[in-house]
């Protein structure tokens, strides 16, 4: 058994893989940099017991993190409870892609590394555009296995919270698919504008990428809220909720 831990700014998503690399369970908890290795093990142990998954023999623990100060907690978790050294995703690993000349990859996120790794595993011969709808939304573009650029914009929840946090009376709303672009009350108007406005941003970004590349592209999406948006954006060819966790295992196998 292998454990994959994808640490984001908002959530920590854990995947449990069988010996063939198939995901057999996933669970999500809020990111908390005050949590100890013992507290995390308590979460982990309870959830695996509930799902009747034995964790007596763990061969490897894989960690991707965009929150550097939490990594050490999970290294302690791996050593204390499973007697293994965690494998940490970074640019020192063997990667299935290269960076184009002129790309400054300093600070390139582990989340983007594993997303690209899995996308390349699935579609090695395609020009790829990968959207990850997380705390921030990122997009990465690869041409024949070469990373040529991308972008970062505020995430959907970040946009909602900014509107709520910087106004006196506007409510915090849930991100959902509205029935109309014309909201009939304040809450529905925010939901409509956020949904269709964000979808419009993504459509336009894809349009501009198409214009710059002038070649056929394949667009993948992942991230918690990506599923809702992908249904609205015809330009997205595929949504994979577990792209990151799959990429974490694929990168591990590539470097084994």
Swiss-Prot record:
Gene Ontology molecular functions: ATP binding; metal ion binding; pantothenate kinase activity
A Pfam family assignment: Pan_kinase
UniProt keyword Transferase, yes or no: yes
Pathway connected to this protein: Cofactor biosynthesis; coenzyme A biosynthesis; CoA from (R)-pantothenate: step 1/5
Amino-acid positions noted as binding K(+) in the UniProt annotation, renumbered to this chain: 132
CC cofactor note: A monovalent cation. Ammonium or potassium.
Cofactor(s) needed by this chain: NH4(+); K(+)
EC number from the UniProt entry: 2.7.1.33
Annotated active site: 111 (proton acceptor)
Residues binding substrate: 109-112, 186
Cellular localisation: Cytoplasm
Keywords recorded for this protein, A-Z: ATP-binding, Coenzyme A biosynthesis, Cytoplasm, Kinase, Metal-binding, Nucleotide-binding, Potassium, Transferase
Gene3D superfamilies for the chain: 3.30.420.40
BP GO annotations: coenzyme A biosynthetic process
Reactions performed catalytically: (R)-pantothenate + ATP = (R)-4'-phosphopantothenate + ADP + H(+)
Binding-site residues for ATP, renumbered to this chain: 6-13, 135
Main localization of the protein described in the UniProt heading: cytoplasm
Entry function: Catalyzes the phosphorylation of pantothenate (Pan), the first step in CoA biosynthesis.
Subunit structure and binding partners: Homodimer.
Similarity remark: Belongs to the type III pantothenate kinase family.
Name assigned to this protein: Type III pantothenate kinase
Gene: coaX
